[in-house]
């Protein structure tokens, strides 16, 4: 690893005189942080370093770092064509706006493309054919985990057109010293194969694609993988804790406090939720739990049986239910007197107005989550975000009816507001709306869980659990960003994160409980792969490997990073050992989101139920009591 460090040092010295800021149109100037300059100098300073992953948490300035590189490209070579592959929602903001603000002179060389476009692959190859043969290509893939997912062969074995673009980039990356930079705060989301595909995009052919990386959930030959992947990424993850862990504030980031809010369904909502569960099993679609997820959030007066209706009949039935519900609420609002009671911390039991009580109970009858969120929003001291992935039927469309009844001002960021959503977010983020006095809340769907920055947020409400921790991290990352709370007074530089979990009166697990457990179980393998990225990053190498001899050129770098990874399963020790200790309960969350069986050895080592080592218990461990059990709260680094 010292050899990698020598080449990093060479690149830094080569570009030592690079500017520390960049100025664009209208004298817009930004001063780069040291870590931003570090990665830019290393990547541009090594001509034969064709690729890098910016594995950096949300809000640290990945876009600014990349635009800085674009601004300084012609100091390396005179002719560049820049291809930026992004989600449609990110084309204008941040990419086009940031380039025009700080590097407008490179805009003429840029081709910005939406990889969600069904015709993306054809447009990509049309643009490739138009590039001058003398030009080098600088490719940027933002939120690269989405691009990788679209290139991955799924269980249906359908052809993925994005894979054609993936193959082209992997094949042509090494030619003419082209450059590829991938950006993501969560490079692995759903599948270990995403790691393999990403590595083979950055370092083509280095890793056998069909060979398993794990044996019994344990990474095979970790040292070999790290040694061959040196300098593959920049790793800036200041908070490696679980999304369910509280994090103290720093000078640059707001404090995060996590709350798991259990809200009991009304009798009516529970009955319809159980019907939704039955219909899912009857229709054979329970694997995605769509019916249950929707019913745990909101229910109409009935749930139609899709099996007995045509698609058109089903849509008409749902539309009629929606219209009936909206008509029932038309013109109705909770009085200011009752809102004042609730905003001061009161409950429904403190309200005296009979009509308000009836209206509140009607709303709660149909959605325990929406009602809880509305009350929480009016009690919040600042601005709020609400994540709701569903738009029609029981999603955002109905939630906004609740907002109207409670007098909550809002903007919506979803697929149905694409023409105005960027402007809406810009207004929402303005300094004169720091306290939410103009617009209190932004409700957003999956369209807004990546690439968008929200400023001065104090409360986030997550109404539906995604299938993985990475997506939840992206959602939370929209509000906790570098200097995102600089306009807040010191006492309000915090973000409360509420996971709103619908509960059944019987105490049985709801779909929200099930999804929380799924999220926890996926993280075991992913955490090992994230460790690989961390220990092969340019930051880790340059900080921890200082015993190197300086180099005068980069002749050997290409060969160093092109070595194949050869996995040896013998590096896994499978022999059973008898260890003395005791059975315990443990959780990775101080909120006790999920509790696991484990084993504590005499020397304070903690193992999971399958015998795999987790961590070493500190001298003064954190222990909580829950339902008569002693629960060890573990922190894994």
From Swiss-Prot:
One of its GO terms (molecular function) is ribonucleoside triphosphate phosphatase activity. One of its GO terms (cellular component) is virion component. Residues 358-537 form the Helicase C-terminal domain. GO terms for biological process: DNA repair; DNA-templated transcription; replication fork processing. It catalyses: a ribonucleoside 5'-triphosphate + H2O = a ribonucleoside 5'-diphosphate + phosphate + H(+). ATP binds at residues 56-63. Its EC number is 3.6.1.15. Residues 43-205 form the Helicase ATP-binding domain. Pfam families: Helicase_C, NPHI_C, SNF2-rel_dom. A motif (DEXH box) lies at residues 142-145. InterPro entries: Helicase_ATP-bd, Helicase_C-like, NPHI_C, P-loop_NTPase, SNF2_N. It is found in: Virion. Keywords: ATP-binding, DNA-binding, Hydrolase, Nucleotide-binding, Transcription, Virion. The keyword Hydrolase applies. Residues 459-526 are annotated as: Binding to the cap-specific mRNA (nucleoside-2'-O-)-methyltransferase. The keyword Plastid does not apply. PANTHER family: DNA ANNEALING HELICASE AND ENDONUCLEASE ZRANB3 FAMILY MEMBER (PTHR45766), SWI_SNF-RELATED MATRIX-ASSOCIATED ACTIN-DEPENDENT REGULATOR OF CHROMATIN SUBFAMILY A-LIKE PROTEIN 1 (PTHR45766:SF6). Monomer. Interacts (via C-terminus) with RAP94 (via N-terminus). Interacts with the cap-specific mRNA (nucleoside-2'-O-)-methyltransferase. DNA-dependent ATPase required for providing the needed energy to achieve the termination of early transcripts. Acts in concert with the RAP94 subunit of the virion RNA polymerase and the capping enzyme/VTF to catalyze release of UUUUUNU-containing nascent RNA from the elongation complex. NPH-I must bind ssDNA in order to exhibit ATPase activity. Belongs to the helicase family. NPH I subfamily. This is Nucleoside triphosphatase I. It comes from Fowlpox virus (strain NVSL) (FPV). The lineage of its organism: Viruses, Varidnaviria, Bamfordvirae, Nucleocytoviricota, Pokkesviricetes.
């Amino acid at each position: 690893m010292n050899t990698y460090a020598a080449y990093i040092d060479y690149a830094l010295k080569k570009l030592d005189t690079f500017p520390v800021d960049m100025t664009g149109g209208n004298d817009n100037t930004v001063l780069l942080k040291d870590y931003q300059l570090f990665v830019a100098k290393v990547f541009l300073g090594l001509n034969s370093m064709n690729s890098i992953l910016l594995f950096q948490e949300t809000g640290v300035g990945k876009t600014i770092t990349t635009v800085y590189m674009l601004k300084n490209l012609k100091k390396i070579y005179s002719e560049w064509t820049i291809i930026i592959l992004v989600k449609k929602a990110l084309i204008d903001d941040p990419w086009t706006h940031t380039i025009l603000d700080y590097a407008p002179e490179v805009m003429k060389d840029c081709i910005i493309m939406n990889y969600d476009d069904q015709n993306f692959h054809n447009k990509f190859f049309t643009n490739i054919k138009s590039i001058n043969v003398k030009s080098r290509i600088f490719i940027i893939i933002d939120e690269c985990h989405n691009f990788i997912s679209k290139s991955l062969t799924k269980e249906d074995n359908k052809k993925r057109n994005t894979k054609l673009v993936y193959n082209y980039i992997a094949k042509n990356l090494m030619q003419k010293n082209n450059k590829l930079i991938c950006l993501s705060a969560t490079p692995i989301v759903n599948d270990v194969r995403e790691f393999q595909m990403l590595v083979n995009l950055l370092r083509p052919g280095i890793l056998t694609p069909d060979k398993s990386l794990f044996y019994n959930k344990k990474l095979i030959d970790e040292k070999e993988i790290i040694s061959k992947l040196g300098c593959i990424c920049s790793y800036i993850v200041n908070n490696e804790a679980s999304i369910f862990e509280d994090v103290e504030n720093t000078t640059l980031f707001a404090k995060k406090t996590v709350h798991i809010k259990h809200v009991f369904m009304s009798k009516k909502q529970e009955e319809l939720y159980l019907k939704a569960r039955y219909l899912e099993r009857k229709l054979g679609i329970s694997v995605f739990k769509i019916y249950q997820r929707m019913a745990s959030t909101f229910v109409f007066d009935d749930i139609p049986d899709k099996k007995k209706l045509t698609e058109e009949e089903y849509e008409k039935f749902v539309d009629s239910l929606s219209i009936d519900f909206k008509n029932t609420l038309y013109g109705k609002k909770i009085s200011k007197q009752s809102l004042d009671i609730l905003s001061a911390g009161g409950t429904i039991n403190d309200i005296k107005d009979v009509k308000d009580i009836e209206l509140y109970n009607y709303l709660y009858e149909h959605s325990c989550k929406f009602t809880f969120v509305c009350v929480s929003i009016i009690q919040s001291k600042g601005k709020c975000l609400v994540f709701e992935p569903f738009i029609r039927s029981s999603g955002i469309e109905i939630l906004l009816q609740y907002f109207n009844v409670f007098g909550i001002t809002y903007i919506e960021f979803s697929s149905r507001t694409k023409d105005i959503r960027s402007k809406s977010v810009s207004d929402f983020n303005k300094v004169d709306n720091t306290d939410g006095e103009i617009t209190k809340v932004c409700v957003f769907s999956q369209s807004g869980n990546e690439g968008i920055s929200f400023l001065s947020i104090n409360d986030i409400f997550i109404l539906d659990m995604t299938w993985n921790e990475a997506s939840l991290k992206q959602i939370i990352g929209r509000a906790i960003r570098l200097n995102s709370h600089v306009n807040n007074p010191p006492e309000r530089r915090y973000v409360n994160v509420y996971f709103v979990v619908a509960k059944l009166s019987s105490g049985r697990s709801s779909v929200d409980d099930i999804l929380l457990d799924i999220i926890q179980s996926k993280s075991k393998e992913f955490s090992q792969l994230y460790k690989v990225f961390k220990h092969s990053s340019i930051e880790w190498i340059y900080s921890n490997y200082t015993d190197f001899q300086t180099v005068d050129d980069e002749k050997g770098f290409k060969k160093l990073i092109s070595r194949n990874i050869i996995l040896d399963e013998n590096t896994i020790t499978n022999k059973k050992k008898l260890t003395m200790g005791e059975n315990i309960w443990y959780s990775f969350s101080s909120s006790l989101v999920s509790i696991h069986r484990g084993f504590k050895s005499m020397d304070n080592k903690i193992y999971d139920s399958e015998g795999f080592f987790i961590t070493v218990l500190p001298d003064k461990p954190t222990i909580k009591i829950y339902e008569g059990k002693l629960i060890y709260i573990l922190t894994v680094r």
